[in-house]
Structures are given as C-alpha cells and as structure tokens.
C-alpha cells in the first residue's frame, strides 16, 4: 500500500501504473495457486485436505500478526519529482511478485473453494477476481491520495485499518474451520 501511495504522490499516472503492475503480479500468483491446488485435488486429495487446514491456521496467524503489530509504517516519499511510469509499474509488479506470502495467502483462500469437480469458469473467476479487485483497490487508493488528499487520513489510521483487517482474517479463518469440521 505504501509503495502505491508513494508513487501516487509523484503523479496520478505513477500511482495507476503501480496499481496495474501490482494487480498483474497478484493475478499471476492467483493463477499459480489455482493450478497447484488443482493438481493436488486430482492427484493427492489427502494432502489437499491437510493444506486446507494449514491454510486456515495461516489466515488466523495473519490476523493475529495484524492485530498485535504496533509499529506505524512510514509514509515518507522519496524522489518526489521522479515521474517514470515504467518504473512505477515495475515497482508495483516487483513488490507483489517477490512476496511469497501472497502465494501462501491465495493457497489459503482458494483451497476453500476448489474441489474435485471444479471447472475452468470457477478457476478463471478466482484468478480474475483477485487481479481486478487488487488493481481497483490500488487505483481507488491512488485517486483518494491524489485527488482527495487522503494521505494523512490513511497515515493516521493505519493502526486501526490493520486491526480491522486482522479481525476480518481471524473471523474468516474461524468460519472456514467450522465449515471444514461439518
């Protein structure tokens, strides 16, 4: 989030390009997660079930980390005058693609949706939804920061935002575990 905000503060187009790059990387991770989980469901179903359980635990863990993290993130902008759109795109793409936790996150989420009788439409929907939602979130964030001047709003509330997201992950993990035990 901070990278997109920093790029958005350089220029609106920088923010948009960073958002698109990030979204494409998220789409790739989503695609690889779906392909990997499909292979597991068809060839190693017991491992798939174990992975579902581990994924639920991971979501709970992410929620706990988000809730207990106290450090405020720094929103300082470096090189504010640099307006290289290609670099903004590459920064957005790189920060997402180099984060292996994203793959684990998608594996955790998608393992709850996939089964032996999946079809290509569901898989396409999972991948495209992740990519589009990610891009749109960061595009909206860019608009909020550049047009409406919400940088200080996010900065002052990053602690609260992190807590809310953490609680949401914990709630999702509890619901998924209840559904798995049924």
Task: List PLM regions with ranges.
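Functional transmembrane helices that embed catalytic/metal-coordinating motifs
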Residues: 1-6, 90-109, 132
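Alpha-helical transmembrane segments and their membrane-interface junctions
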Residues: 105-114, 175-180
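Selective transmembrane alpha-helices of multi-pass membrane proteins
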Residues: 43-74, 133-141, 152-182
